[in-house]
Amino acid sequence: PKDNTEMLPVAELIERFDLPGVQRANARFDIAKLDWLNFEHIRALPTADFKSQALGQLQAAGLDAACRDADFTDAALALCTDKIKNLNDVAGYIGFFFHDDVVLDAEAAAQALTPENKPHLATLREAYAGLATFDADSLMESLKATAAAREVKNKVLVMPARVACTGSKVGPSLYHLMEVLGQAEVLKRFDAALARM
């Protein structure tokens, strides 16, 4: 429209459509703009609608969210509402929450789960095992303290921790995803990663 409005309800689009206003120049399909528009529509979805559609995507990918309790599933879904550009991305972004065992991306594992990182991840595992409060803030502070004690940068611990928990180099906030997974599950996933290293 002439007022530069970028998102309109379908009824208003129909009402405001003006064929003489359509330019004759060659049209181009802007994928980046489509991604942005999808992102905005996802963010605008009511929570129940987003959950229904996201669960459908997880099910289509062979992931059974029903095997987890509703609070866990809701917390996992909340981590992706402001991040994904397309509902088709849901399973790839948070699917790791619904696997009993981490499915490792080979490239991520080769980069992060190295023999050099094993002592760092083992020390972080012990720090996390000793936490009385297992929330995002406590996890972040514990990681920073562990990195300082080992005289390494935070990223030396962040990437192995992320790959151990998710199998991937990308995904939701590390500290928030670990909070959702819970202490026992994070320690289990760390142990599995350490055994591979």
Label the predicted regions.
Residues 109-165, 170:
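C-terminal accessory/binding modules appended to enzymatic or scaffolding proteins
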